[in-house]
């Protein structure tokens, strides 16, 4: 069963629709105990880092870590969900889940670039490491982004793909059974549908 914890910071309807298009079925759960039945987990979210971690710490963390770290259930973090998997964020004060050896940093450039935050819209994603999650037919794919912070991995082997906005940043990560994407596959049409299909087959 694919489960999606119903944190108070996600666009779950769009994700459920994409999973349905892929021929899968996902259950939006409000009880952490239902994570014990999961064979795939999607951690989705938008918003502030500390708010997300407060939501997880309040009721989800123990069962999430049992599923992901002990039972090794594949998990896909989307946008804030990916950032919460890291050790910390410049956006907040609370520690993250720490599953990925990485920190989350705010975009910062010289003023002459005249770039705006959030980084919003379509961007090309370049695959830097082969992985079944991103087997979509070519090395450069386009996905939809909405974010002001990005993940900086301490271990380059955890980086699956990058994108460019002023400079190259991490667009997708993987460490063992843990996957994350900074973009929104549920808003990324055929590329997003293929990525979700790939995750369901892992």
Question: Could you tell me what each predicted segment is?
Answer:
Residues 79, 147, 184:
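Histidine-centered divalent metal-coordination motifs
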Residues 3-6, 144, 179-183:
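Active-site-proximal beta-strand elements of phosphoester/diester hydrolases
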Residues 48-51, 83-93, 183-185:
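A short secondary-structure junction motif
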Residues 41-44, 68-89, 97:
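Catalytic nucleophile loop
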Residues 1-74, 103-108, 191-202:
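N-terminal beta1-alpha1 cap of cysteine-dependent amidohydrolase-like domains
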Residues 150-202:
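C-terminal and late-domain segments of enzyme folds
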Residues 88-165:
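Pocket-forming structural segment of enzyme catalytic cores
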Residues 74-77, 96-97, 117, 142-143, ...:
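A residue-level structural signature of the nucleotidyltransferase/glycosyltransferase Rossmann-like core
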């Amino acid at each position: 069963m694919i489960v999606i914890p119903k944190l108070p910071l996600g666009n779950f309807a769009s994700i459920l629709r994409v999973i349905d298009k892929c021929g899968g079925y996902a259950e939006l759960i409000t009880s952490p105990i239902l994570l014990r039945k999961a064979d795939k987990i999607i951690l989705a979210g938008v918003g502030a880092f500390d708010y997300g971690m407060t939501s997880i710490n309040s009721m989800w963390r123990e069962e999430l870590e049992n599923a992901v770290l002990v039972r090794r259930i594949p998990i896909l973090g989307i946008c804030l969900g990916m950032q919460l998997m890291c050790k910390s964020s410049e956006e907040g004060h609370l520690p993250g889940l720490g599953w990925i050896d990485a920190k989350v940093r705010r975009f910062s450039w010289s003023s002459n670039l005249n770039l705006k935050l959030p980084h919003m819209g379509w961007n090309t994603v370049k695959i830097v490491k082969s992985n079944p999650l991103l087997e979509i037919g070519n090395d450069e794919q386009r996905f939809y982004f909405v974010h002001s912070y990005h993940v900086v991995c301490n271990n380059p082997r955890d980086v699956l793909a990058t994108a460019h906005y002023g400079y190259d940043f991490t667009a997708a990560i993987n460490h063992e059974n843990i996957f994350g994407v900074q973009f929104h596959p549920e808003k990324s049409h055929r590329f997003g549908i293929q990525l979700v299909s790939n995750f369901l087959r892992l």
